[in-house]
Every structure is written in structure tokens, then in C-alpha cells.
Amino acid sequence: MRTAYHEQLSELSERLGEMCGLAGIAMERATQALLQADLVLAEQVISDHEKIATLSARAEESAFVLLALQAPVAGDLRAIVSAIQMVADIDRMGALALHVAKIARRRHPQHALPEEVNGYFAEMGRVAVELGNSAQEVVLSHDPEKAAQIREEDDAMDDLHRHLFTVLMDREWKHGVAAAVDVTLLSRFYERFADHAVEVARRVIFQATGAFP
């Protein structure tokens, strides 16, 4: 009975890892759509989001079934409760990539971003994908040391977010209010994507150690 239980727990981790991978791919494609005003790619991200939503629902259901039927305690209870919380975090990562793609679609055929901030968003996209990949790795490996490193990787996103705001607040900004709103929203989407990846890492640490960093 316990063997079957631990197999189900392992399957749940694999499903969470798959969700992280899909969220990372979605953000990578959404960033390309944003930078290149690529409507086809934006539409692909939007249509593919259903995969993450389906996996999210299945993972959450699996976790609650384990919780209800197995009455886990101690480490097993931590693992399931953390998994339920991770489902929500990873689901939000996918939703944030979806938001980026929708802005790219809404502004098409124009570019949503002024050319002078493209470099910031190219780098924010790179960091976001890296964080998504790292989150996938620690969800599958349950490695608390690697999970702790993700919090450091997030510093790069925070720095980019701050620097971008100095550009927006500069008197030399000449792209108008609508562009400033888009840039602000998009920057926030990338920052929140990174924050949720960090939350996933924190929950992996809690699963492994019982201490919440």
C-alpha cells in the first residue's frame, strides 16, 4: 500500500516538473512574440495554455486524493501540502506567460515595446526561462541546496525590473503613456513569474528539511 502511495507521490512530482517545463517554454515563446511582434507565436502560447491548466487540475486532484485517502503524517504530509501550493505557483507562472502573449497579440501588427527597452525584456525573458528550468530541476530532484540557489538567480530579475523603472521615469521618455503602461505591466509579469519560481524553490526546501526559508 505504501509503495503505491510513494509511486503516486513520485508521479505528482513528475507532473509538477512537466508543468514547470511548459511554463518556461510558454514564457520563452511569449517573449519572442513580444520582441518580434509575432502573432502566430503569440497565438500558440495562448492556445497551449490549456495544457498547463489541464495538468494543474489533475495535479491538484491527485494531491487532494492522496491527502484524503492516505492520511499522511510528518514528511509525507509536508510533501503533499507543498505540492498543492506548488500547483498554484506554477499555474500562475503559466498564466503570466499567457498575459505577455496577449499583450503581444493585442498590439499586433505594431510592436508592444519601444525599441530602446527591447534589451531589457530580452534579458528578463532569458532569466525567467532559466528560473523556470531551475524550478523544474529542483521539483524533480528535491535538492534543497539547488533550490536555495534559485533565490540568488532571482536577484538578476529584480535588478532588471529596477533599472527599467529608471528608464520609464526619465524625462527623456518620449513614447507616451500607453507604451509606459505596457512596459510597466509587462515588467511586472516577468517579475511575478520569477517570484513564483522562487516560491516553488522555497516549498522544495520545506519539503526536504521541514524548515521554511
UniProtKB/Swiss-Prot annotation:
It is found in: Cytoplasm. Its main location: cytoplasm. Disruption phenotype: Defective in persistence phenotype shown by increased susceptibility to tuberculosis (TB) drugs rifampicin and pyrazinamide in both minimum inhibitory concentration (MIC) testing and drug exposure assays. The MICs of rifampicin and pyrazinamide decreased 4-fold and 2-fold, respectively. Reduced persistence in the mouse model of TB infection. Mutant was less able to survive and persist in the mouse lungs and spleens as shown by an about 10- to 30-fold decrease in colony forming unit (cfu) counts compared with the virulent strain. Homodimer. NCBIfam families: phoU_full. Plays a role in the regulation of phosphate uptake. In this role, it may bind, possibly as a chaperone, to PhoR, PhoP or a PhoR-PhoP complex to promote dephosphorylation of phospho-PhoP, or inhibit formation of the PhoR-PhoP transitory complex. Important for tolerance to antibiotics. This is Phosphate-specific transport system accessory protein PhoU homolog 2. It comes from Mycobacterium tuberculosis (strain ATCC 25618 / H37Rv). The gene is phoU2.
